[in-house]
Design a protein with these regions (language model features):
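Short beta->alpha connector loops at strand-helix junctions that form conserved
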Residues: 4, 23-28
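A short helix->loop->beta-strand "cap" motif at the edges of active sites that frequently abuts
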Residues: 19, 78-82, 108-110
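Aromatic/hydrophobic pocket-lining residues that form π-stacking "cages" and hydrophobic walls in ligand
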Residues: 10, 72, 102
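Active-site phosphate-binding strand-loop segment of PLP-dependent enzymes
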Residues: 26-97
């Protein structure tokens, strides 16, 4: 189950693996808030294995509240599901609302699969280096089998990612401030357009 809209490649990845995606619609009228528990439950069957969220959401930018994350946690517990949480954009939050990682949800620690990427945080578009992080040993072993069946990410991407991870934190703060300034400028300009 995924919220819709969401990152377009989720659907392609799922189809290529033989999985079925069940979308739960969000809407612009309420700012893309998480749909009700009942909307999720309408999609849950005995074949449902996971809920996949992107937090903050791509493409809407919506950041789930603590209450919404607790609702997802409760669904995961109630139906014995996994929660896959793509948190690649967590360093790109420009509001005062707190960011709640799926890893901070008590009671489902063994059911959380966190997805991360260096390309978003370090502006490395096209460098496909990321991480799948879980405390679940069975999921970890299954992922390792898949990883060992493949070769490896391109060497140049690995070198770039390693270098990026050594970047001083001050640089990331400067980049954040620059993006925040650009965001605020764009919002100011859009607000000056009648009807927008």
């Amino acid at each position: 189950i995924i919220t819709d809209p969401s990152y377009a490649n989720y659907m392609a990845f799922a189809v290529s693996c033989g999985a079925v995606i069940k979308p739960v619609k969000t809407n612009i009228e309420n700012g893309f808030k998480l749909p009700s528990v009942e909307e999720f439950e309408k999609q849950i069957t005995d074949k449902t294995r996971a809920i996949l969220i992107c937090n903050p959401n791509n493409p809407t930018g919506y950041l789930y509240t603590k209450q919404e994350m607790m609702q997802i946690r409760d669904l995961v517990k109630k139906y014995n599901l996994y929660l896959s949480s793509d948190e690649a954009y967590r360093a790109s939050i420009y509001t005062k609302r707190p960011y709640i990682s799926a890893f901070h949800l008590e009671g489902i620690e063994d059911h959380v699969i966190l997805i991360d990427s260096v390309s978003k945080r370090y502006s490395l578009c096209g460098v496909r280096i990321g991480a799948l992080i879980t405390k679940n040993k069975e999921v970890h072993q299954a992922v390792m089998k898949f990883c060992q069946a493949r070769l490896s990410p391109p060497l140049i991407g690995q070198v770039i990612a390693e270098s990026a991870l050594a970047t001083p934190h001050e640089y990331l703060e400067e980049v954040y401030d620059e993006y925040l300034s650009r965001r605020n400028f764009l919002i100011d300009q859009l607000n000056q357009i009648p009807g927008v």
